[in-house]
From Swiss-Prot:
UniProt-recorded name of the protein: Acyl carrier protein
InterPro entries from the UniProt entry: ACP, ACP-like_sf, PP-bd_ACP, Ppantetheine_attach_site
Role, per record: Carrier of the growing fatty acid chain in fatty acid biosynthesis.
Positions bearing O-(pantetheine 4'-phosphoryl)serine: S36
SUPFAM superfamilies attached to this UniProt entry: ACP-like
Gene Ontology biological process: lipid A biosynthetic process
CC per GO annotation: cytosol; membrane
Keyword Manganese among UniProt keywords: no
Entry PTM: 4'-phosphopantetheine is transferred from CoA to a specific serine of apo-ACP by AcpS. This modification is essential for activity because fatty acids are bound in thioester linkage to the sulfhydryl of the prosthetic group.
GO MF annotations in UniProt: acyl binding; acyl carrier activity
Length: 76
């Protein structure tokens, strides 16, 4: 099972944001300032960290930290 802290570590690494800004409700683009390339890198980082494949269709729906945690928990 993915934990919030593990997902947060990937986000901090890939987006270079302060970990205090990474909350379950935080949106990658609007709140954490990710651009389209960073969003792709974030998804790839999550795939590598958790050993899951996130298809493009699913990646487009993952907009918040909690959505990423939920997707990983449900697909690991």
């Amino acid at each position: 099972m993915a934990t919030f802290d593990d997902v947060k570590d990937v986000i901090v690494d890939k987006l270079g944001v302060d970990e205090g800004k990474v909350t379950p409700e935080a949106r990658f683009v609007e709140d954490l300032g990710a651009d389209s390339l960073e969003t792709v890198e974030l998804i790839m980082g999550l795939e590598d960290k958790f050993g899951v494949t996130i298809p493009d269709e699913a990646a487009e729906t993952i907009r918040t930290v909690q959505a990423a945690v939920d997707y990983i928990d449900n697909n690991q």
